[in-house]
Amino acid sequence: IKTGTWYWQLTTAGQALSTKPYAVPAIISFLEGRSLVYHSFILKQGIRHLSWVHVDLFNFHWTKRYFKSNKHEKKCYELMDDVIFVSNDAKNKFQQLFNVTTSTKVIYNLIDCKTIVLRANEFKVEKRKFTVCLVGRLVRQKQFDSIIRVARIFVDNGYDIDFWIVGAGCLESDLSKMIHDLHLDDNVHLLGYKPNPYVYIKCADLFVSCSLAEGFSLVVAEALCLGKAIVSTKTVGPVELLGSNSEYGVLADNDDESLYNAIKLFVNDYNKVFVYQDKAAKRSLMFDVEKTMNEIYSIL
């Protein structure tokens, strides 16, 4: 993505915002990229300025299209009083890229395990066989093409497994064609957008995340709340959530063979599913709504 592609389109709107005659206790740009650009135009309208970073910008620098240069993006972050990250690893990768002097803090995403568990029990779905569930937008970052290729490897090796992909997005037609071309219509199922994905995560035997980059991975945290055995590629958020040595879920390198081998561990030995379900339930105790809210209030 070319640096600065959209910056000049944002400038006019940002300058218009800067003329608004009001001041507030705090202004928060809760997403990277465009919202930070707008924020940089309205500094006089707020007393405190906070910006959130949700992703690994070192490995997936999708925001550069909104800035004139990396130096310009760094300057915008250094105009903030605090930059907040959703994981320690996301912060470390950010500093590798920008090395800002601004105050930085880590506050995990708000995860309400009680509500997630309640919603997972709202209704039931049925599975036919060993089932792997994935949830996310059908975009390049999530790498669902990888899991389709992995499914082909399983079929070629005589396994009969279902893969559920819950989500919608711009790559839906491409992924659907790939499934059909690889003769996987009976194994890989694009379920589309579901307002309650937790039911599908709960029903499946294994939850998988095959993303290219994640800052925290909300869906991995939600799968932990549901006590699911988890396989994830080694992106910064899941590594922090699951443990760098796969203490709470199995981490795989970002290639098809590694992902296949990690999933196969559970398919070949269902006892591992039970073991990691127990580990996930224990790990979910790290999520504390009151603690997270107090951390947010403390910086406002």
Predicted regions located by residue number:
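Nucleotide-activated donor-binding/catalytic signature segment of Leloir-type glycosyltransferases, i.e.
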Residues: 176-192
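Carbohydrate-associated surface elements
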Residues: 89, 110
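A conserved mid-protein helix/loop that constitutes part of the nucleotide-sugar donor-binding site
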Residues: 130, 134-153, 159, 163, ...
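Membrane-proximal helix-turn-helix segments that form the acceptor-binding/catalytic region
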Residues: 14-22, 66-83
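Conserved acidic donor-binding segment of nucleotide-sugar-dependent glycosyltransferases
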Residues: 244-257, 265-270
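An aromatic- and histidine-rich active-site surface loop
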Residues: 5-17, 25-46
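Aromatic "clamp/platform" in nucleotide-sugar-dependent glycosyltransferases that forms part
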Residues: 193, 212
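Short hydrophobic beta-strand element within catalytic cores of glycosyltransferases
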Residues: 229-232
